[in-house]
């Protein structure tokens, strides 16, 4: 860090502005975009993944609708600790049709594609006590690379977020995690989550 620079207070920020930041995301091209267009870049990025990128460089063809189902499930479970079994149940609950993502192997395959495309950033669990791993949660917390992608997958707007503060909270947590991860990468550090299983 540069200790010669003065720390600046950014002042207060309204919850409405945070909702807009969640939809806008960290896309440099989105900084000066009109407010009614801030969700277009994340949505276009998801569309590009589904229509072009997910099958590029691979002989195996993946189904666009299944990938969309998975992305929407990951978005619904943003900043949550969920396994593949829970993702499958989530898809069965929210999606219609017979051709669902119904096996863990298929979910793993599609998650590998998203990982290869740097679209997911699973946050590892912190564990200091190496001799007693049962005392803390070990599962990673699920994140798309930018919370604006989760918002785009779910068709969220600032107004919709403000009407659903539970979802707003998970997206805000993802925003904080994204920014802290960027700082930690610069410092060659790691960002973990912690959940104590002892009750």
Say what each PLM segment does.
Residues 2-48:
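Amphipathic alpha-helical "lid/sensor" segments that cap RecA-like P-loop NTPase cores
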Residues 1-2, 96:
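Accessible peptide chain termini
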Residues 31, 35-199:
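Accessory nucleic acid-recognition modules appended to NTPase machines
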